[in-house]
């Protein structure tokens, strides 16, 4: 049967072609239109911020990389196709059984489409992928030296950081391009008769043989280059079963020689492949390729495995000793843990302390932090929210200021931001949402070492934070009662206000003031934004662009937008910093501060590498995970790093959105490279004002990475390192509701870096022994300007209780558990344990402090905010417990120990400070010490006063409760005493409410 005639492609009419072109144009517009709009909006946004050079540099770099990579890969593939076509056989036998004849006809009919379209498509894809590597290329072009050489090849580390990644990228693209050219060449020769799979002779034309052999030879040469580069990558290699990163004994003595041998074999094989051009014998290159494959299996895989199993494993500690030492040195360099940064000191951890010694530690005892920033947010909401649309984050921040007596104190701080998601009813209307409710109002700070009033029951008036507020007052002036003066408390930029899909506000003078600002007793006062931030939307072009950007027609039709209108968008501080510095990794925490009478958001930025020779490779998400990060879902991306520097401090003005980047690490070669890529975007460290320096803090995420590494890399001896016997562990959070590691804590305490009693703002963490619950070390990182970044490690030799054991001892103490059982009222009230702080006090001792909160009911509603109810402490197996820090210290160390402790502030109702309410235990009411009976009760009526029967009965109940409390005191029965206090509280309430 004859073969069916080859079908021809149908011809399109003119109308069909026009319709297809229109359809393609519409598709292209739909695909490219949003991207063009986004690019134009970004151009406007970067220009408004003063960072347009960043936008243009990144855009031009991406375009050039796209162009070069696309032309390179597409050109090589095109060359493979073109050579195959131009050297095709003049006569191609065409019998009826030829399976490719039909395809050959189709290709010949659309030769330009296939000959240009296929390379263009491949080049397009290659360019799209390559442009994402613009960071690697810019570092190659601008990277410099580290001034440190690797211990194996003697090359400066700048080669590994900046050059080697580029060489590997270039090699990968060349390999892919040549391979695709080889495939294209094979297909073309097969299609046009250069390769025939039928018949006994002429299976491969001369031109096909030359071209294919040449391409295979180039691939083998590229493989030889890859073997050469593999040698350097061994120094940042991780292999299973090896307790360190980098080349070990097997890598240096087996894998490294194997790479050189394989490189030589690859060069020989390439020569054998090229020989087929002249010798016309394909068996020689085939033998060469088989030899290369076998060599890679025997020399590259089998031989190192034999060395590892026979020579290394039986004597691993000794064999790997030299290379472990290399890893210890490199890891300390890469993570900023060298001897000029980290100081180790011996510390007993269980030294005895007298009341006088504890009182002398005034910087510590007067600053014991009672407010847990993860717990007190509902109290901020209850007392300071004001309106339904204002909001405080669930986790607040810690910063320090000098109080009115010029004492350094730590504060729980928060900005009262506007939360668009909390708008209700007509507030959600587009005009109200984007032109009326535009900003927050106020900076709130609470001294972390005190509360207002003593509460023995969560329903009492006490135990809540003392609030220092900077806010726009009822008369329109700024009330500046906060820890520092603030000229402009309005907040247009922040992490809360931006946490919504439609993150923009339209501001500017278009008639009467429109923006909600504050309320008086008579009416609502509005405001008009006067800051420099924002992109103009006064022209119809801008209105059209933003209407398309946000898919909102009101930009075109609303009369609230005028010639002076501006749009504020991209208002998240971290995202703004990441946009203007795309080479930075930002810390998960951003905190507000008052600097030079302006409210700013402060962020930490990191420069990182993932190929620092011999340095431990670390996952940022794993290293920075703790109970707070897990609870509030703030985990960093799963990025692998082997080098990190807190190279940049960034500020974002809360009013006008100005982003300022400051150089923090003046020695970081990675930062220096980026400062050359984007000149003028990062200000020198000398531009950091003293006012800003006073609020910079050691970054939390960096500290968590460093403490995880210090758990291993504090060890100097490589044999001990290999045995892991002296490793440490990051302790788990002892709080029963936590599910991860204990977070580090910012505190003000005595200066560990200077080893004196001056007050110091520091970030601290306890460290456990490996797989044990006993303390191994105490780490403190200084945030003071004079000693910023200095890390002090107190090593603890004995068996000192770690956080878990301390928490267990406190919570299971009979007196504590009985008292909290009374307060909890059989789970009718919720008891919450605050952060467990570890504080060095006295001469070599460690004090554990854990505040206790209680809230009415079992819910987390703002109306049932937690109140500080007790303070629990532990020192050398002894428990201190009471309503105040002073009480707990006196009970733990004896009278006078708490003399320096900060007192309780008066309640809003005016109750005097440091005076327990009617049913509060006196300072002696501590475990092991019977409390004094309560005496503050309603005054007895004068003889001439006749009480109603109900009041007389209530008075008898009060007297009976007092008697029961005194009896419990004599017996030392703490549970009975607590029950008597509760009876007394109920009786007093009944007396006051009875007519």
Curated annotation (Swiss-Prot):
Membrane topology: Multi-pass membrane protein
Taxonomic superkingdom: Bacteria
Protein keywords: Cell membrane, Membrane, Transmembrane, Transmembrane helix
Listed transmembrane segments: 18-38, 63-83, 113-133, 175-195, 210-230, 259-279, 287-307
Region (Disordered): 900-948
Gene Ontology cellular component annotations, sorted alphabetically: extracellular region; plasma membrane
Subcellular location: Cell membrane
The UniProt record lists the keyword Zinc: no
Major subcellular location class: membrane
Ranges of compositional bias, category Pro residues: 928-941
Protein family (similarity comment): Belongs to the UPF0182 family.
NCBIfam families noted in UniProt: PRK00068.1, PRK12438.1
Name under which the protein is recorded: UPF0182 protein MMAR_1371
